[in-house]
Amino acid sequence: MRPPPFNPEIRRALRIDVSAALLFAVFASVTTPFIGLILRRELGATPLQLSVMSAAGGACLLLSLAWARALGGRPPLPYLVWPSFVARGLFLLAPLASSAWSLVSLVVAANVFGAAAGPAQAAVVERLYPRAARGRALGLVRMAGAALGIGLALAAGQLFERVDYRVIFPGAAVLGMAASLRQRHLPVPAAAGAGEPTVGGLRQAWAAVRDDDVFRRLLVASFLFGAGCWIQTPAHPLLLVDVLHVSAAQVGVFAATAAAATLVGSAWWGGLVDRRSSLDALWMMYLVGAATPAICALAWDPWVLVASSVTDALVGVGLDLVWMVVVIDIAGPARAAQYVAIGATLAGVRGILGPLLGGLLIGALGVRAVYLMAVALMTAAAWLVVREPARRAVVYSGSW
């Protein structure tokens, strides 16, 4: 059955959201895929420095409950726009990052402000897009960015072979900041009724987890899957540079392939969460995620990583889209920001421990052992979601 067309309010929001996504795609395409490569190849970052950067990025998420509490019942849009504006603007300082530690510090600072926008993003999405169209709307936004990212990634790979990152990153920062400013025009409705309640602190978060059996079980699965993701982070630059000797041009090809996969995945995941239980989409996403470390563990040639780029991109857009819809479905409008903050806080815990554990595994058993451990953790997460009793229900906000 063909889904109904978007109403005028959704179309208006999509015009703004898509234009912001296009600007952000330029920023992301010439920064994120190349940070690890620059740190290892050009600045000689050690496994310890790579682990510290990843763990610090996770530690930033520990502040999620504080950010959600600061949001409270206030309009969420400013809490989305301005932290992301600062996070992207920090890349203007790239010309000052002449050592591994200085670039690591810049990335960590950007992660602090980026994490601050997480709870507000969930609140904006919940208000902006009705549940029946939420998956398709978010998928369309991601598709727009991915379509532009295909060509950008290929060009960026060649650009980094010719131009210093200290020149490229500030230019990207300007466009990233413009994307944040564009989001200021999103027509976010006011909260229904008296507005969203105060999120509270750790005690209220513990009460929410204790009282919601479904959410608690999904947090366990999410923790296993996320741990599998995080332990890989210090291994990726080492696999690229030391094991497979990947060039910047090849990284550009991988990123372009990932953008193409994101284009397809955005449409598929978005349609799936609107047609079926969002938990069905979640376990499928977790299984696809387990394929990425499996491919990396077996990779014998740089071009094998094209396949892992596809699966990693499918999971990346799935984590962004499917998990947000799952949490909003479970929480309902009043608790969406709190539930997102709880999930992000636990992501911070595994984000600290995962990279450090990954670094220890690399030292003891080698790079590929990390990927085998990740496969086991991520497969276990998928199994837990498959066994979830609530999975068979078609989930809509407030249905539990």
Model features per residue range: what roles?
Residues 37, 41, 69, 73, ...:
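Transmembrane alpha-helix termini and helix-breaking/packing motifs in multi-pass membrane transporters
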